[in-house]
Design a protein with these regions (language model features):
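The canonical Cys-X-X-Cys-His
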Residues: 63-72, 84-94, 140-146, 163-170, ...
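Soluble extracytoplasmic domains of inner/organellar membrane proteins
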Residues: 124, 132-180
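A short, flexible N-terminal coil/short beta segment enriched in small residues
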Residues: 18-22, 90-95, 99
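Primarily the internal scaffold of c-type cytochrome electron-transfer domains
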Residues: 2-6, 94-126, 171-222
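Axial heme c-ligation environment in periplasmic c-type cytochrome domains
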Residues: 58, 130-133, 151-155, 203-209
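Short Cys/His-rich "knuckle" micro-motifs
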Residues: 76-80, 97-101, 150-154, 174-177
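N-terminal export/targeting leaders of redox proteins
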Residues: 1-52, 56-60, 64, 68, ...
Length: 222
């Protein structure tokens, strides 16, 4: 029987198969990298605000405690955003006539809230409660990064599920003393054997739930 295909067809078929596999793997790699990139997660992206509030100045330079502005962080799901009255407690006397703060004064006069842009925007299907994390030994900087070094606030973590699960699977890696919850200089992760042992102690003292609860879908998706 005469040969229908040229003998080079075998090589062409192999090249096609290998090429398809390579392209498939490459596309999968690109998809994974895009999913983890700042383009998708918003990590490292500075958000321009109506008034460029500097955490570096207020927290880092002036030493203002997180709870002065985020008053409900220890008692509610939301940490809370400060009202304009909170801003004006200081700025009636400090920078009282600065053009830079005119939007703040206008908000104070009219009673219309400042339209802050959300920095950490969790999807609606994810439930997060600030108070339970704070009261179980998770510090602000563990999730939010060193805000005392941020002239403009940005999202320091991906906020993706694998990031959340890293802590829920091994909370002892990220716990700290309760008196250090709002301390920006405290370590964000326990790495050495001694630090991990401390983490295990805090985990027991704070009665942190086990993996069965922390990894349950309903814990974060309600």
């Amino acid at each position: 029987m005469p040969q229908i295909f040229h003998h080079s067809t075998n090589a062409l078929a192999k090249i096609t198969i290998y090429g398809a596999v390579f392209i498939g793997v490459a596309l999968l790699w690109v998809a994974v990298e895009l999913n983890r990139s700042s383009w998708n997660t918003g990590q490292w992206v500075e958000k321009q605000q109506p008034v460029q509030f500097s955490h570096k100045h207020h927290v880092g330079d002036d030493g203002i405690d997180c709870r002065y502005c985020h008053t409900s962080v220890e008692t509610a799901a939301s940490a809370g955003m400060p009202s304009t009255n909170t801003c004006m407690n200081c700025h009636k006397q400090i920078w009282a006539d600065s053009p830079y703060l005119e939007p703040v004064r206008a908000s104070f006069r009219t009673g219309k809230p400042i339209g802050w842009i959300r920095v950490h925007d969790l999807p609606d299907y994810a439930y997060f409660n600030h108070s339970i994390h704070v009261n179980k030994g998770v510090g602000c900087s563990t999730c939010h990064g060193r805000v005392d070094d941020m002239p403009i606030a940005y999202q320091a973590a991906t906020l993706q599920m694998e990031w959340c699960l890293a802590c829920h699977r091994q909370p002892e890696r990220f716990l700290r003393p309760k008196e250090k919850i709002f301390d920006m200089t405290w370590r964000t992760e326990n790495k050495s054997a001694e630090e991990l042992q401390e983490g295990m102690t805090w985990k027991a003292d704070y009665k942190v739930q086990g993996r069965a609860v922390l990894e349950s879908c309903s814990t974060c998706h309600r």
